[in-house]
Design a protein with these regions (language model features):
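Conserved active-site and SAM-binding loop architecture
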Residues: 1-126
Length: 126
């Protein structure tokens, strides 16, 4: 199974999926520290930076897309405050354009209360 990793961070999803026998074919991350960690552990994997700038028609279609998009808009720590960007639309754009066979979407519990209908609606329409 060929995997594309969104919001890769330091590669937790990637490592687990790789240990399960899957192949990481690309990663999306724009935090410098995280990129250094990814480069050390996956030196031959293609990396992309700002997810908003990616033209998905030029990216290899994986079998599986995984990721945990940044969650300040729905995190308990930010409850009641509009903090940070809402990155689900970028995750959905990637899924819609790439049409992988599988997707793993991870996020905080607050997503269930705050915006789960939007996420499920987008997934159902794909």
């Amino acid at each position: 199974v060929r995997v594309g990793s969104l919001f890769s961070g330091i590669g937790g999803f990637d490592l687990g999926l790789e240990r399960a026998g899957m192949e990481i074919v690309w990663q999306v991350e724009n935090e410098p520290y995280c990129i250094r960690v990814l480069e050390k552990h996956w030196p031959n994997v293609r990396r992309y930076g700002d997810i908003k700038e990616i033209d998905w028609s030029k990216v290899e279609r994986p079998d599986l897309v995984c990721g945990g998009f940044p969650c300040p808009a729905v995190s308990q720590a930010a409850r009641g405050r509009n903090t940070g960007e809402w990155f689900w639309p970028e995750f959905a754009r990637a899924l819609g354009d790439l049409q992988p066979d599988y997707a793993i979407v991870e996020n905080v519990e607050g997503l269930l209360r705050e915006r789960m209908a939007e996420v499920v609606g987008d997934l159902a329409s794909m």
